[in-house]
Amino acid sequence: LWADRGEPATGAKLRLPFRPLVGPYDSTDPAIVAWHCRLAEAAGIDAFLVSWWGGANISGEAFERVILPAARATRVKVALNCELAQFHGEIGPLVERLAGVLTRCQGDPAYLRRAGRPVVYLYQVPFDPKLTPATFAELRRGVEAKVGPVWWAMDKIRHDAGTYGVPAEWRATEGIDGFGFYGTFSVRRISERAELRPFFARYARDVRTAGRELLLPMHPALDNRVIQPKEGFAIPFRDGETLEGYHAAALAAGADVLLLTSFNEWPEGTVVEPSADWPDPYRHLRQVARWKGREFVPPPLPAR
């Protein structure tokens, strides 16, 4: 769930390819977040990886005060997508911030656990990653000394053409439980089934060779041209075929975890959250529900 310190009541200032069904909002609104959790539950989405920047914006406050309590009322779990793993200065302050939030939150029944440990996803930009194997080891030691064992998911993919796997030094790094990456569009402009299958299979080989779990992204669409007019591009919806193709390719590669990128990253246009600009606002959530063998029944809209 994205959080930022914008002016959510002034929709004209938002630079989005299409509009949320409920209008502009931010993730400190309990009614909106509760609705998000009910939408996810209705579709069969198991968990949210929540964009977390600590005190750098409202995401830290939103996670602890709003999102975690909202998830508690549903079967949906939540975990930290630690963006500070990419955007930080020294490791010491990052250890303190991450250990602090885990100390306060990991015991909550709504916090996502895997193999009995709290999950933390460490976001990295493919072409300029901040963490090194050595600094990750320092981060892991520092955090686990304070909170106990953590299930670490590392965002890691080579971006130089012809590889697109996991760098050898990272495959050899201890303490990483799973490898994945945020989006194919960050490294290659592909979206067709015939392109995705070998791409995911190549990445999966590296992850399996390292003996780690495999996390693969799935996109319903993309349109980041509003926020990146020079470099942005679009992946069309294709009447649902785009998301179906990603889903099929991820399953064929043997993914342990399917990353639905994204629930509500509106500026990039990768969302499954209902939009007022779609003939069926719930089109993507209905797709996910079918995968889970259920009929999607929309929960009531939040009071605004």
Regions found by a protein language model. Name each.
Residues 1-304:
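Glycan-processing catalytic domains of CAZymes
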